[in-house]
C-alpha cells in the first residue's frame, strides 16, 4: 500500500505541473481555494469513514493564531452532485463497493473544468478504507495541497507582476513569480519589501541578504536575529513602531510569560535546500501581529544568505489562504546565477 501511494503521489506531482493550464476551451473551475467537495453516500458520511475523512481534512492548521481547518469540506450525496458542482476545483469521490479489488486512490485532472483535480477513493469495505486513511490520509490530503500550490504558481507565471519581478531579479539575482497586485513599499541594497493590501487585511513579503559566516549563521537564534534586523525596516502604524518577531507568550499556568521560538525545518524545493521558520510577528510599540513563514538558503554565487520572509495581517478574518498563497511563492523561485 505504501509503495502504491508513493508512486501515486509522484505521478500526481508530475501530472499536476503539466495539467494546470490557463487557456483552454474548458470552463473555469469554481470554488474557493482549499475547499474540497466530497461526494459520499450519506450512510458512509455519517459513519466511521466520514468521521475519518473529516478528521484528516479538517485538522487545524498549525502556527496561525486562530483555529482554521486544513481544508473546508463540502459534503454531497452522489444524487446531489449536479449542476455546478462537477466544475469544482477539488473533488474527492468516495466509493465503497465489494467489487473493488483493492483500497486505493487515483487522480484525474481537468475532467470538466480547469485547473481541476478529481480524486476517486475506493475500497471493498469501510474498515479497509478507514485503515487506508489512518495510514495514508496526510498523503492523500497532500495531493490536494499540491494542486492548490500549482494553481498559484502557474497563475503567477501567466499573469505576473512583471515590473516587480524584474526589480527583484536585478537586485537579488533570483527569478520569482508574483500575482499582480503587489506594490513595492521599500527597497535598498540588501532589502526589498512588497505588500498586497486589502480593505481589512494585508499580505506582504520581504527579501533580504546578509553574509554567510558558517553554520552559526543558520541557527534558529541567528536567523531570528537577522529577521528582526530587517523587519525593523517595516514601520508600524504609530510613530517609532516597527515589526519584530514574537519571542514570548503568556504562561497558561500563571500570570507570567514563557519563551516562544519559531518552528524550524529544512525543506528541499526545486533542488535547493531552504531553512523554513514558522512563527508569529508583532509590532514593537503598537498592537499588531500575525503569522509568518520564512525561507533561507545560501546563494553560492555570492556566499550570502538570502531570505524570503512572508507575513499576513488579518485581525478580523481568516489567515490560512492568505498565508498559503505566500508560501507558494518559494516554489516559483530560481537563482539566475546558478543556471
Where are these regions (language model features)?
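Bacterial N-terminal signal peptides that target proteins for export
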Residues: 1-8
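C-terminal motif of bacterial Sec signal peptides marking the signal peptidase cleavage site
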Residues: 16-19
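Secretory pathway targeting signatures of secreted, lumenal, and periplasmic proteins
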Residues: 22, 39-41, 179-246, 251-254
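Solvent-exposed alpha-helical segments and adjacent loops
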Residues: 26-40, 95-162
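N-terminal "mature-domain start" segment
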Residues: 29-31, 39, 43-46, 55, ...
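Signature of long, low-cysteine stretches enriched in small and polar/charged residues
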Residues: 69-128, 235-302
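Short, well-ordered beta-strand elements
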Residues: 117-128, 204-210, 304-313
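Surface-exposed amphipathic alpha-helical segments
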Residues: 130-154, 182, 303-339
Amino acid at each position: 500500500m505504501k509503495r502504491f501511494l508513493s508512486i501515486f503521489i509522484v505521478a500526481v506531482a508530475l501530472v499536476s505541473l503539466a495539467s494546470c493550464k490557463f487557456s483552454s476551451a474548458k470552463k473555469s473551475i469554481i470554488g474557493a481555494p482549499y475547499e474540497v467537495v466530497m461526494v459520499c453516500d450519506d450512510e458512509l458520511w455519517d459513519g466511521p469513514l466520514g468521521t475519518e475523512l473529516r478528521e484528516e481534512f479538517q485538522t487545524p492548521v498549525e502556527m496561525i493564531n486562530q483555529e482554521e481547518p486544513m481544508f473546508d469540506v463540502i459534503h454531497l450525496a452522489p444524487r446531489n452532485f449536479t449542476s455546478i458542482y462537477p466544475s469544482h476545483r477539488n473533488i474527492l469521490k468516495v466509493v465503497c463497493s465489494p467489487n473493488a479489488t483493492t483500497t486505493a486512490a487515483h487522480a484525474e485532472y481537468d475532467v470538466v473544468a480547469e485547473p481541476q483535480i478529481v480524486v476517486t477513493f475506493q475500497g471493498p469495505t469501510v474498515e479497509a478504507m478507514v485503515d487506508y486513511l489512518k495510514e495514508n490520509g496526510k498523503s492523500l490530503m497532500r495531493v490536494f495541497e499540491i494542486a492548490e500550490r500549482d494553481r498559484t504558481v502557474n497563475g503567477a507565471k501567466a499573469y505576473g507582476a512583471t515590473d516587480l519581478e524584474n526589480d527583484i531579479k536585478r537586485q537579488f539575482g533570483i527569478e520569482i513569480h508574483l500575482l499582480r497586485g503587489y506594490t513595492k513599499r521599500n527597497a535598498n541594497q540588501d532589502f526589498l519589501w512588497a505588500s498586497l493590501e486589502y480593505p481589512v487585511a494585508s499580505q506582504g513579503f520581504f527579501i533580504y541578504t546578509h553574509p554567510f559566516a558558517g553554520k552559526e549563521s543558520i541557527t534558529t537564534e541567528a536567523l531570528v536575529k537577522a529577521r528582526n534586523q530587517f523587519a525593523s525596516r517595516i514601520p508600524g502604524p504609530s510613530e517609532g513602531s516597527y515589526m519584530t518577531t514574537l519571542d514570548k507568550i503568556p504562561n497558561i499556568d500563571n500570570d507570567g510569560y514563557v519563551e516562544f521560538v519559531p518552528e524550524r525545518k529544512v525543506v528541499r524545493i526545486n533542488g535547493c535546500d531552504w531553512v523554513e521558520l514558522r512563527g508569529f510577528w508583532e509590532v514593537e510599540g503598537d498592537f499588531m501581529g500575525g503569522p509568518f513563514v520564512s525561507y533561507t538558503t545560501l546563494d553560492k554565487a555570492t556566499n550570502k544568505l538570502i531570505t524570503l520572509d512572508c507575513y499576513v495581517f488579518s485581525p478580523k478574518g481568516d489567515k490560512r489562504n492568505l498565508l498559503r498563497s505566500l508560501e507558494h511563492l518559494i516554489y516559483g523561485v530560481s537563482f539566475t546565477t546558478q543556471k
